Amino acid sequence: QVYSRTEASASELASRLGVPFVTSLDEVCTDADIYLVMVKDAVLQELIPDVVKGREEALFVHTAGSMPMDVWQDCACRYGVRYPMQTLSKSREVDFASVSFFVEANGEPELEVLKELAASLSDKVYEATSAQRTYLHMAAVFACNFANHMYALSAHLLEKNGLPFGAMLPLIDETARKVHGLHPRN
């Protein structure tokens, strides 16, 4: 089952997964073993009490890199994090087999479930504490968001001077390929 506040988002994901969807938290089933909560970091904490209510014995998992695992501790008995370190866009397909997943849980049985869940998508599964994940998320912002900002500045500079940004793509691609074999400082 998929829940989203908007029918468009709920129906799109539910259709891809072949499951029903709901747009009210009151309609979310109460007998699932795991609730995977994938929302913007800013709304996670306010949503938690309503998501957990009536489902306290289930395993609750969020996917936020910058939010600690313990956001669940006042409401849920079993909880954790399954963080896919990847930039995600609705308009682009992601090959999850190549994505690194970082997991953390408040108990060993829960951790094993999260490892298995992540391993069903990728063989790049790592344990990381909330503190480690904070630095991981910060490093990801540097590697991805800052790079994208630099691309935007580059595109603006080129377009302003009548040059195509596409001319930069071979350089960008080679730079990205090099980091697979050389340390970034090289």
Where are these regions (language model features)?
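A structural preference for short, hydrophobic beta-strand core positions in alpha/beta folds
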Residues: 2, 21-23, 127
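Residues at the starts of beta-strands that form the adenosine-phosphate
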Residues: 1, 78, 124
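Internal alpha-helical scaffold of NAD(P)-dependent oxidoreductase catalytic cores
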Residues: 5, 9-16, 93-180
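Rossmann-like NAD(P)(H) cofactor-binding subdomain of soluble oxidoreductases
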Residues: 7-10, 16-94
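Conserved SAM-binding loop
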Residues: 2, 36-37, 103
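Short, intrinsically disordered, charge-balanced linker/junction segments flanking boundaries
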Residues: 1, 181-186
